[in-house]
């Protein structure tokens, strides 16, 4: 058993080599399919991934979004993924015989009377045995070929033929059946469960059984969850004893067979990248359910609900029933007034008035409450109105019909979905408009690059022999975006993304405007029983006219928006692609592959530039080849044409020589020779070089050809930029322009503006650019706080020393006074680190542990400072008499760092300036009150004597314990209310105190940072003494 994994690995390697060798067979129809098959057949897991890529959702009949797949993996980790990749339900090769046409078709749904589910689980163990047998058969075929000399490839192909039934375990189980399949030691748990009208096979998770693959149960079961009145016990819908329902709603387009609005639109779409059509289809189905019945999803099914109670769920029907008596009263009043008019006139009115009278009554009745279509019936369900039968279908289909005429009128042939080779079902014909929009957006954003690459290279010759990786429709902005991202230049990024963002913004506005117009038409249509009767009287006729005008405006506004978009796209096409024409290729069985048992095929129309120059005139071909878009999208072809043109210009015919390529004579045939073409004749083609004077030493001819390419590129760029500028400015007024043209309401207030996405993206890019610029500036300064400090005053230690807080460049917390030094701990208190004036007495060091000191110690041993710095402006202060708590400790290095980083709040919170005095001042010191207060030495700058400066701000009103201003203004009372004047006076006082605090803090910060200038050099000792007295007395006057 130890050798089993190694043997299995060898078998897999051999199978891969042999499978890859089969691809060299000449009769391989498609190399890509063969490679995918080779990779797919290695293990059960790779087969599961391959089936997802080629045949969507082969493990289930009910399509689920990718979000469900992600959530299930979280609910059932490992188990769900293993079961998901090995499970097969929608597989014709396994179940085609038992279920003709596919297990997922409507005919092959689960029978409610005999409820069972058939599914298969892939076994790697059986697959390894099948591969081993294939290896043996291949070896025998090779040996036979050696002996007989025949070709062994047919036998090898037959040996490796993929027969899924050989390595799949097939199960047919009913609900609540469960089991375990062991695959190479890994258990695969499964259980069959019933979920409403579905039968599923699942695995175990944290929440119980997690469904993995499901299929529907046949209708009706036992009461339809889609049509509430469809019941097998209702004999009105049964015509035979087999309980076969004949309900007309059983086969409507939005029944269970349709797969929902998203799937219906996706299946009907003909573009490679589907974006907008599912949204529009879902909106249309919602409107149909709202206006007709919840059981239908299209106006084509309106006849299915005639004389049916399901109309009760219609909002329009309910409003019509409620307005029935009011409309009848309006009609009665109109008849009475018309009769009174005839009686008062005294003569018979003309016949046209009788005709207008009758037509008005019929019009109002038909479009407001409906006409009875069943003679003798009084049921409101028998009434059919003109809004449902005529107005809504005309308006809603007209929105898309008028716009599609403009959208498909592309001169270049790009994204035209109304050609003879493509057709839509009548119920989804409107999707041609949204396919054209999706195709345009995908083409300009480069979302269709991969599909165009494969189609253009493979479907021409059905192989990769002439594969050109560089020939795909990459939008030109990609070539600007790549260097912009690499260089980090946000200006290039903005320039590169300007046009795609504008395309996205205008496209989003078109979709939003169309949806808003459809919803607005629905709202106005529901109110038809209220506005239509106003048509009867001249006094209320204006309301009816406004109602009709709004309906028509909402019908035409999307067409105006589409006209603008197609104009913008056409100018863009001409600016970037010149006169290039696009060719389309209809792909059958496209990337999605066969869905639901190979019974459905989605055709995709892919567009690419037609490079068959025989279809162009000479002028159009040159315009296309010299366009910026063609050169960027086809670099190999452009380089080849450039080299060919250069050779033709260098190796040209002689001037004034008549050439005939078909002539037999070599001289007449004009075989090109080097140097025969003159420089003058070459330069004559370029008008912008007409002023060049030829002379000896002119440059070679071939580089001169670059002028033409550069000229074409610059002209294309200028045209594109000018187009972008015009369209950007015009798009800002697009909503108002459309409203003015149709005399309606502008949608700019209720819909996304045409420039919304563009402006938001540009603002994000600008913010990113500012952030990048800030990082660059920070990096240029060294990226560290030391450099920042150096630029603002030298080294950290020098700044501390110069401020009185450090003893050298090392930043140590030592302080010098008269040749004696006091050494404190690393985290010195503010009094020891910043106020050494009050701690050195008589040249003796004061212990740092002392907690009770005099605020003003002896001044006899201190000499006056020669150039004191001006003190900050004082605010209202108050000095207490006792020290209640020891001030928090702070190091000088922290003070410097906070100063350099402009952190005023941290500084004010760390420097506790509350200093109180417990002991009385000694008598010896009281005898000399006139002696001025001085600093240590001239080495200590007076600007950091913060005992005085910070003492000024310690009792400002509104400060909390962290020294932050917390007082807030109150604006609860309004003008005229009691207490309003007192409130405003208090607010003014708070503003004054806040301003004083901010001013004092700023001056204190400048003093600590050493940036305040020396403005007090003229002050004498008396000024300092007066300053001390004012502080001691609590005065709030400024010195």
From Swiss-Prot:
Start-end of Low complexity biased regions: 812-836
Keyword Transmembrane helix attributed: yes
Compositionally biased spans, kind Basic and acidic residues: 917-939, 1004-1033
Protein topology in the membrane: Multi-pass membrane protein
Any one Gene Ontology BP term: protein secretion by the type IV secretion system
UniProt biased composition (Gly residues): 802-811
Subcellular location: Cell membrane
Ranges of biased composition (kind: Polar residues): 843-861
Residue ranges of the region described as Disordered: 654-680, 799-875, 917-949, 1004-1039
GO cellular component, one term: plasma membrane
Keywords: Cell membrane, Membrane, Signal, Transmembrane, Transmembrane helix
Pfam families documented for this protein: TrbL (PF04610)
InterPro entries associated with the record: Conjugal_tfr_TrbL/VirB6
Keyword Methyltransferase tagged: no
Transmembrane segments: 326-346, 354-374, 387-407, 491-511, 517-537, 551-571, 710-730
Domain of life, source organism: Bacteria
Coiled coil: none
Cleaved signal peptide residues: 1-28
Family the entry assigns: Belongs to the TrbL/VirB6 family.
Protein name in the entry: Uncharacterized protein RBE_1265
Species annotation: Rickettsia bellii (strain RML369-C)
């Amino acid at each position: 058993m130890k050798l089993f994994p190694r043997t299995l690995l060898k078998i897999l390697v051999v199978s891969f080599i042999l499978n890859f060798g089969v691809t060299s067979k000449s009769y391989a129809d498609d190399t890509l399919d063969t490679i995918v098959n080779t990779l797919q057949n290695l293990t059960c897991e790779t087969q599961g991934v391959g089936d997802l890529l080629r045949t969507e959702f082969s493990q289930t009949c009910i399509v689920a979004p990718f979000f469900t797949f992600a959530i299930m993996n979280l609910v059932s980790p490992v188990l769900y993924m293993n079961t998901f990749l090995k499970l097969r339900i929608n597989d014709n090769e396994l179940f085609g015989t038992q279920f003709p046409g596919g297990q997922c078709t409507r005919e092959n749904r689960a029978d409610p009377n005999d409820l069972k589910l058939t599914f298969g689980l892939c076994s790697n163990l059986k697959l390894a045995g099948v591969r081993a047998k294939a290896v043996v058969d291949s070896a025998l075929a090779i040996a036979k070929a050696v002996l007989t000399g025949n070709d062994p490839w047919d036998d090898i192909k037959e040996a490796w033929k993929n027969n899924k039934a050989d390595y799949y375990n097939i199960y047919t189980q009913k609900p609540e059946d469960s089991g375990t399949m062991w695959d190479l030691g890994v258990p695969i748990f499964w259980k069959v469960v019933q979920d409403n009208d579905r039968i599923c096979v699942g695995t175990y998770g944290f929440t119980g059984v997690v469904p993995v693959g499901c299929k529907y149960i046949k209708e009706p079961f036992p009461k339809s969850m889609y049509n509430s009145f469809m019941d097998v016990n209702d004999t009105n819908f049964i015509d035979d004893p087999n309980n076969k329902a004949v309900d007309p709603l059983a086969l409507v387009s939005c029944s269970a067979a349709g797969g929902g609005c998203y799937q219906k639109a996706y299946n009907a779409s003909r573009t490679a990248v589907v974006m907008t059509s599912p949204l529009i289809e879902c909106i249309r189905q919602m409107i149909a359910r709202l206006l007709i019945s919840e059981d239908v999803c299209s106006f084509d099914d309106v006849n299915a609900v005639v004389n049916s109670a399901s109309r009760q769920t219609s909002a329009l029907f309910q409003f019509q029933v409620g307005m029935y008596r009011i409309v009848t009263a309006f009609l009665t009043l109109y008849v009475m007034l018309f009769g009174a008019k005839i009686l008062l006139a005294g003569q018979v009115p003309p016949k046209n008035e009788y005709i207008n009278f009758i037509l008005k009554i019929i019009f109002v009745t038909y479009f407001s409450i409906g006409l009875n279509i069943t003679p003798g019936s009084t049921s409101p369900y028998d009434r059919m109105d003109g809004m449902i039968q005529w107005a809504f279908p005309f308006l809603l289909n007209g929105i898309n019909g008028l716009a599609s005429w403009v959208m498909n009128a592309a001169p270049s042939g790009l994204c035209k979905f109304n050609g003879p080779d493509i057709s839509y079902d009548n119920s989804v014909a409107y999707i041609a408009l949204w396919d054209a929009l999706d195709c345009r957006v995908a083409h300009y954003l480069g979302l269709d690059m991969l599909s165009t690459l494969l189609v253009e290279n493979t479907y021409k010759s059905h192989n990769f022999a002439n594969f050109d990786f560089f020939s795909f429709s990459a939008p030109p902005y990609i070539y600007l975006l790549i260097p912009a991202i690499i260089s980090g230049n946000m200006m290039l990024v903005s320039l590169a993304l300007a046009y795609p963002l504008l395309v996205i913004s205008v496209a989003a506005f078109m979709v939003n405007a169309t949806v808003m117009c459809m919803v607005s038409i629905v709202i106005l249509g529901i109110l038809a029983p209220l506005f239509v009767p106003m048509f009867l009287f001249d006094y209320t006729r204006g309301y009816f006219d406004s109602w009709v005008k709004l309906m028509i405006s909402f019908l035409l506004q999307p067409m105006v928006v589409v006209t603008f978009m197609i104009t913008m796209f056409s100018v863009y096409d001409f600016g970037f692609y010149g006169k290039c024409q696009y060719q389309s290729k209809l792909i059958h069985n496209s990337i999605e592959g066969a869905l639901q048992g190979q019974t459905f095929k989605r055709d995709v129309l892919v567009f690419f530039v037609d490079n068959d120059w025989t279809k162009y005139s000479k002028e159009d071909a040159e315009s296309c080849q010299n366009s910026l878009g063609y050169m960027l999208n086809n670099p190999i072809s452009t380089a080849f044409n450039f080299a060919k043109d250069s050779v033709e210009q260098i190796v040209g015919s002689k001037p004034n020589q008549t050439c005939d390529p078909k002539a037999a004579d070599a001289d007449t045939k004009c075989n090109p020779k080097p140097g025969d073409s003159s420089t003058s004749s070459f330069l004559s083609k370029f008008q912008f070089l007409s002023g060049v004077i030829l002379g000896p030493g002119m440059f070679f001819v071939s580089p001169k050809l670059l002028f033409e390419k550069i000229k074409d590129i610059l002209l294309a760029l200028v045209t594109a930029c000018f187009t972008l500028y015009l369209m950007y400015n015009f798009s800002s007024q697009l909503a108002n322009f459309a409203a003015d043209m149709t005399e309606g309401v502008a949608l700019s207030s209720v819909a996304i503006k045409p420039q919304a996405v563009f402006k938001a993206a540009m603002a994000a890019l600008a913010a990113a650019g500012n952030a990048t610029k800030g990082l660059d500036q920070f990096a240029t300064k060294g990226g560290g706080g030391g450099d920042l400090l150096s630029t603002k005053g030298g080294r950290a230690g020098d700044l501390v020393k110069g401020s009185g807080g450090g003893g050298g460049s090392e930043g140590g917390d030592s302080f010098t006074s008269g040749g004696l030094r006091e050494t404190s701990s690393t985290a010195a208190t503010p009094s020891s680190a910043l106020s050494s004036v009050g701690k050195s007495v008589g040249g003796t060091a004061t212990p740092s542990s002392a907690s009770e000191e005099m605020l003003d110690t002896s001044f006899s041993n201190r000499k006056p400072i020669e150039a004191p710095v001006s003190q900050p402006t004082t605010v209202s202060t108050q000095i207490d008499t006792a020290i209640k708590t020891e001030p928090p400790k702070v190091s000088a290095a922290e003070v410097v760092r906070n100063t350099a980083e402009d952190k005023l709040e941290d500084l004010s919170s760390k420097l506790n300036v509350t200093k109180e005095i417990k002991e009385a001042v000694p008598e010896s010191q009281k005898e000399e009150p006139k002696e001025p207060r001085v600093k240590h030495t001239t080495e200590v700058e007076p600007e950091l004597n913060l005992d005085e400066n910070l003492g000024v701000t310690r009792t400002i009103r509104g400060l909390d314990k962290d020294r932050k201003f917390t007082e807030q203004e109150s604006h609860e009372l309004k003008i005229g209310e009691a207490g309003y004047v007192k409130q405003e006076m208090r607010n003014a006082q708070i503003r004054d105190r806040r301003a004083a605090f901010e001013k004092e803090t700023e001056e204190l910060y400048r003093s600590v940072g050493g940036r305040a200038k020396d403005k007090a050099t003229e002050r004498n000792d008396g000024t300092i003494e007066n300053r001390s007295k004012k502080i001691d007395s609590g005065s709030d006057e400024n010195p």
